[in-house]
């Protein structure tokens, strides 16, 4: 039970009455009258608070399943009142590691009504987290006290990679495949026949299917699509550089999100997708397979993995791929680069992949470094920071240039944009038949 401001105002009023009685009567009468008044106020407040108990609202939290890291995940509480209106304050004991939109929720319910209260939480790390109970405060009928109690709602909730982003990507790819966005498909792109469609202005006349046209009343053209059943291998570094925080998440988490997004795109395009995670050794290897069941396997196997403070063995990871994968494949290495010296082993490892495989190096850039490098300043300390940022960018560009000279594809993008840009590059490679 918690007294409201109304009780404290009444108690202060008792003091004012005591002063007034002390003037008119004796001090003893004033003290006795004040004590009786205050005790009456407190007694009424306690009694008023107990009147809430039979009218306690019913509160429950809708079941929480998979939460997505780095996303605003909605949490919904259902509140039901009885015959009388209810004014309540709720506090849900979410994990302290999460960012939350509303620490407390307030509502005023009409008699015999149900209301849903929603807040969002944003996890910044993966794993299993403990949710606590729900604390409820309900205002008494006379407004003298808050009746306070807890509802048991403890549960464990798992935080996964960005499943929300995967769902959005899946919808987008499905729309492209089913024809809703098929107008974006370019004629003649790819090597496999996809469909026939009516000739349109600007279409290449070399793509007209004359036999089909002869059977029809209008000219028809062939639509080609990229070859399917190719192999996509993704190697995800979980070494020391991937433990750094970038835009609220670890580099590894950004890399894991982009890994799963690329895997989804590959599976959607009919390719065989395999993934390896490595530090000093390959700690997880999931052989290439086709089909949507492969995505579920990838999510379950990769979600528990965390980055470690170990230097990665690029050569060892690539060697394992070379020994196990005989077919030509696109090999995507998701990592980070500091300078030419630090990336020497990476360059040596990726050179081993050519020409049998198509190596693709993907790095996650920290936007804060770009901001420091391109923000003029007059302060000495900030000038030093800017110089370091400019040097870091220059060293990375030299390393990227060396990779490109050896036939390695390179993508360096801000961490928050890496998934979209990586998928776009992959679809371009498929369209150009470079695999």
Question: In which residue ranges do the predicted regions lie?
Answer:
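Extracellular/lumenal glycan-associated context and N-glycosylation machinery
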Residues: 1-60
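An amphipathic, basic-hydrophobic helix/alpha-beta surface used to engage anionic
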Residues: 39-293, 328-335, 341, 348-352, ...
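Short beta-alpha junction loops
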Residues: 281, 364-368
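Short, charged loop segments at secondary-structure junctions
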Residues: 286-312
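Acidic, Ser/Thr-rich peripheral helices and adjacent loops at domain boundaries
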Residues: 296-298, 368-398
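Exposed acidic/Ser/Thr-rich ligand/metal-binding surfaces
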Residues: 312-365, 412, 432
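Short acidic-hydrophobic, aromatic-tinged amphipathic segments that line or gate anion-handling sites
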Residues: 409-415
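C-terminal "exit" segments of structured domains
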Residues: 418-435
């Amino acid at each position: 039970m918690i007294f409201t401001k109304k009780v404290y105002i009444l108690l202060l009023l008792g003091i004012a009455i005591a002063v007034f009685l002390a003037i008119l009567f004796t001090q003893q009468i004033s003290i006795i009258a004040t004590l009786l008044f205050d005790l009456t106020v407190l007694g009424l407040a306690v009694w008023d608070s107990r009147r809430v108990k039979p009218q306690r609202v019913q509160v429950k939290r809708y079941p929480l399943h998979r939460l997505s890291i780095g996303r605003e995940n909605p949490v919904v509480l259902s509140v039901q009142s009885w015959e009388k209106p209810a004014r309540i304050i709720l506090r849900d004991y979410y994990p302290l590691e999460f960012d939350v939109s509303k620490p407390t929720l307030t509502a005023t319910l009409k008699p015999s009504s149900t209301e849903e209260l929603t807040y969002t939480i944003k996890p910044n790390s993966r794993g299993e987290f403990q949710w606590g109970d729900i604390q409820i405060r309900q205002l008494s009928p006379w407004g003298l006290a808050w009746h306070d109690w807890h509802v048991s709602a403890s549960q464990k909730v798992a935080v996964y990679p960005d499943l929300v982003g995967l769902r959005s990507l899946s919808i987008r790819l499905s729309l492209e495949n089913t024809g809703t966005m098929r107008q974006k498909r370019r004629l003649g792109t790819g090597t496999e026949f996809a469909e026939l469609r009516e000739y349109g202005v600007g279409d290449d006349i070399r793509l007209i299917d004359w036999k089909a046209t002869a059977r029809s009343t209008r000219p028809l053209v062939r639509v080609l699509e990229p070859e399917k059943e190719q192999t996509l291998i993704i190697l995800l570094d979980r070494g020391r550089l991937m433990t750094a925080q970038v835009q609220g998440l670890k580099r590894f988490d950004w890399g894991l999100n982009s890994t799963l997004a690329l895997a989804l795109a590959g599976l959607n395009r009919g390719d065989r997708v395999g993934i390896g995670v490595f530090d000093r050794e390959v700690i997880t290897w999931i052989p290439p397979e086709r089909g949507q069941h492969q995505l579920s396997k990838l999510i379950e196997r990769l979600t528990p993995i965390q980055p470690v403070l170990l230097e990665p063995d690029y050569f060892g990871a690539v060697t394992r791929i070379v020994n196990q994968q005989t077919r030509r494949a696109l090999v995507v290495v998701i990592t980070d680069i500091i300078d030419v010296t630090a990336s020497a082993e990476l360059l040596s490892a990726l050179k081993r992949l050519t020409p049998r495989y198509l190596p693709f190096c993907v790095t996650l850039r920290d936007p804060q470094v770009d901001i420091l490098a391109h923000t003029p300043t007059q302060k000495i300390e900030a000038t030093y920071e800017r110089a370091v940022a400019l040097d870091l960018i220059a060293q990375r560009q030299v390393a990227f240039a060396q990779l490109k000279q050896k036939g390695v594809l390179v993508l360096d993008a801000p961490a928050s944009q890496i998934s979209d840009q990586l998928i776009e590059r992959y679809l371009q490679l498929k369209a150009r038949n470079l695999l």
